[in-house]
Curated annotation (Swiss-Prot):
Subunit structure: Heterodimer of a large and a small subunit.
Name this polypeptide is given: Uptake hydrogenase large subunit
Species in which this protein is naturally found: Azotobacter chroococcum mcd 1
Enzyme class: oxidoreductase
Encoding gene per record: hupL
Similarity section: Belongs to the [NiFe]/[NiFeSe] hydrogenase large subunit family.
Length: 601
């Protein structure tokens, strides 16, 4: 496995390609690469183009309200940000939540994982691999044999695919679709035959309904989506075993049965459509093993899907770190230790007193400093090319013990596999065996997993794990309620008079995109300081003062592009991370002037 290059070693002499904005993501992102005479990427620059100021807004506010602000960081992985904020306050105040609340939070969290893995694959990254225009050439009868061979799925008749093809033809011919004017549909990077393309379009449409239905679990337990309700001390939904006082709402029994139906529907789709589709893409593009970068070297997970409340050793996906490419050693992670988690700003549009030193989030500073390097091409309001030797992003550089890390499903799965989690090992071994059998290859874990395709497979496998374990949580919740426990919140420390004068806490979770942490300091009942490090700030990190490069930039290196002006290869790899730039950055004006003033009561 090749060594991880330092920024000082990257070749910037070739042609510069700018992708701005990177589309089919959440938020605003810019990417610049240099390509050599053979169209190989030799340098990559990933930029967050908006400033996030919610940490500043939270200062001086009631910590019980923090979740209502920070969940607005993002409308996609909506519940996980709120949950992590609530956990930080509970940690600071020493609050233990009831078992029912633990199970309900787990169900809501895993539901988000399921939906937020299905949507990126089918609706954000699938068009990097699938040519919908080519699907018009497919024979519906021949296509119907494909899903039958892959898995048992009800919607696989010739008539079904003929109907989808007719809809697609009208859509393309209408001229109102990006399929015709904005796609790179004649790019030789697209290698799939017409039949898999038609099957993919059909499943694209099915996934729209699946993701819409599964998210209704949030509305049952959290009242709405996006931005479902939680509360410090538990969850905001009461257990009501009859209709008395339900104000026209469902009883708990009716609601729980509804939740179970959604779980089974998502499970069927994941096993019979999603996983086979991912393996089908991998089989067609079996030689496209670009997009590795940090997974072969540095990986981080905070751990998630805790079975026993308060016991991180019971995580289905454990916490841990891998550094230096040593997959044989999973290191422990402690997010409270100042030397472990640090933020740097030497290449970010922020100001520190000493920009050669990193700050732990409990001591974090969010002070903007928008300035461009001397080799920037263009103006402050119309940048043509960035000068990455200086400040170039609104994302801070994050490091674990001095290492840039990749986070997300692939990191979680490699760490879980190397930690001996049997469910994960069976999934990975089964999938790799199926890939090798269908392609005639004999790739090992370290050859396949650290790649764009491996990252995409890990997301699908985690979706399967999440939806399977939701059944366990549902059964445990029903059993606990039947045993007479109806508690969903611990309000013993709701009154600020019960709080210490000063306290600090941290809430951690694994969002769909990776490690998520919120660090909070309290003083006199108010928030003194608040810092959030979200997954895209790990993966989208700019370079630090030592030249360490982040996951996005590292993953793009050494990729060969068919046509640099049609950057489908860049999109494939970036979309495999499912970037969420709104989580990592928010808003900026060209010259720092006030854009608007909002009074928040």
């Amino acid at each position: 496995m090749s060594s991880l290059p330092n920024a000082s070693q990257l070749d910037k002499s070739g042609r510069r390609i700018v992708v701005d904005p990177v589309t089919r993501i959440e938020g605003h992102m810019r990417c610049e690469v240099n390509v050599d005479a053979n169209n190989i990427i030799t340098n990559a620059v990933s930029t967050g183009t908006m400033w996030r100021g919610l940490e500043v807004i939270l200062k001086g506010r009631d910590p019980r309200d923090a979740w209502a602000f920070v969940e607005r960081i993002c409308g996609v992985c909506t519940g996980t940000t709120r949950w992590t904020s609530v956990r930080a306050v509970e940690d600071a105040l020493g609050i233990q939540i009831p078992y029912n609340a633990h199970l309900i939070r787990n169900l809501m969290d895993k539901q988000l994982q399921v939906q937020d893995h299905i949507v990126p694959f089918y609706h954000l990254l699938r068009l990097d691999w699938v040519n919908p225009v080519n699907a018009l050439k497919a024979d519906p009868k021949a296509t119907s044999a494909l899903p039958a061979a892959l898995a048992a799925h009800a919607k696989s008749s010739p008539g079904y695919f003929r109907h989808v093809q007719t809809r697609l033809k009208k859509f393309v011919e209408s001229g109102a679709t990006a399929c015709s004017p904005n796609g790179y549909w004649d790019n030789p990077a697209y290698q799939a035959p017409a039949r898999p393309d038609l099957m993919a379009v059909a499943h694209y449409l099915e996934a729209l309904d699946v993701q819409k239905d599964i998210v209704e679990i949030h509305t049952i337990f959290g009242g709405k989506n996006p931005h479902p309700n939680y509360m410090v001390g538990g969850v905001a939904c009461a257990i009501n075993l009859d209709d008395v006082g339900a104000a026209g709402g469902r009883s708990t029994c009716t609601s729980l049965n509804f939740v179970l139906e959604r779980i089974h529907e998502a499970r069927e789709f994941t096993r019979n459509v999603y996983l086979p589709d991912v393996l089908a893409v991998a089989g067609i593009y079996k030689d496209w093993l670009y997009g590795g970068g940090l997974p072969g070297h540095n990986l981080l997970s905070y751990g998630t899907f805790t079975k026993v409340p308060g016991d991180k050793s019971s995580d289905l996906l454990p916490a841990g770190a891998i550094v230096g490419g040593n997959w044989d050693e999973v290191l422990p992670v402690d997010v409270r230790v100042p030397e472990e988690i640090q933020e740097f700003v030497s290449h970010s549009w922020y100001r520190y007193a000493d920009e050669t030193k990193g700050l732990h989030p409990w001591d974090g500073v969010t002070e903007p400093k928008f300035e461009l390097g001397p080799n920037t091409k263009g103006t402050r309001t119309n940048i043509k090319e960035l000068d990455e030797a200086h400040k170039y992003s609104w994302i801070k550089a994050r490091a674990w013990r001095g290492h840039a890390m990749e986070v997300g499903p692939l990191a979680r799965y490699i760490i879980a596999y190397r930690s001996g989690r049997e469910y994960v090992k069976e999934q990975v071994d089964r999938s790799l065996a199926a890939f090798n059998q269908s392609t005639g290859l004999n790739l090992g874990l370290k050859q396949f997993l650290p790649s764009t395709l491996g990252r995409t497979l890990a997301r699908a496998l985690e979706c399967e794990l999440a939806v399977d374990s939701m059944l366990d949580d549902w059964q445990a919740l029903v059993g606990n309620i039947k045993a007479g426990d109806r508690a969903t919140a611990n309000v013993e420390k709701w009154d600020p008079s019960t709080w210490p004068k000063e306290a600090k806490g941290v809430g951690i979770n694994e969002a769909p995109r990776g490690a998520l942490g919120h660090w909070i300091r309290l003083k006199d009942g108010k928030i003194e300081n608040y810092q959030a490090i979200v997954p895209t700030t790990w993966n989208g990190t700019p370079r630090d003062h030592l030249g360490n490069i982040g996951a996005y930039e590292a993953a793009l290196l050494n990729t060969r592009m068919e046509r640099p002006d049609e950057p489908v290869e860049i999109l494939r790899t970036l979309h495999s991370f499912d970037p969420c730039l709104a989580c990592s950055t928010h808003v900026m004006s060209p010259d720092g002037q006030e854009l608007t003033r909002v009074k928040v009561r």
